[in-house]
């Protein structure tokens, strides 16, 4: 039987607005803004491997924080991430983390 996952709020990033008030924005909005800024600064050139660039900018710190949270326990980290341990080990190696 499928296990129901608890409803989770989207990941948010706390930011300060112009009035120095804390504002929580969904992570996806920050990613959209970062990609928008990146594309705007290309001076008309088309990027290559944009998908890999964005993915690595998100994946590396996520793996780092999950590994810290699990105190290096790869089995627990893989379970938290919803991937198998072999895939986790491959990703850790890719980023020089394992």
Swiss-Prot record:
- Give the signal peptide, or none: none
User: Record's InterPro entries?
Assistant: Fis_DNA-bd, Homeodomain-like_sf, HTH_Fis, Trans_regulatory_Fis
Q: Which Pfam families match?
A: HTH_8 (PF02954)
- The answer to whether the entry has keyword Transmembrane is no
Key word Nucleotide-binding present in the record? no
Query: What keywords sit in the KW lines?
Result: Activator, DNA-binding, Transcription, Transcription regulation
- Portion annotated as DNA-binding: 74-93
Q: Which GO terms describe its molecular function?
A: DNA-binding transcription factor activity; sequence-specific DNA binding
- State the function annotated in the UniProt record: Activates ribosomal RNA transcription. Plays a direct role in upstream activation of rRNA promoters.
Q: How does it assemble?
A: Homodimer.
Q: Which NCBIfam families match?
A: PRK00430.1
Q: Which family does it belong to?
A: Belongs to the transcriptional regulatory Fis family.
Question: What is the protein name stated in its UniProt record?
Answer: DNA-binding protein Fis
- Gene symbol of the encoding locus: fis
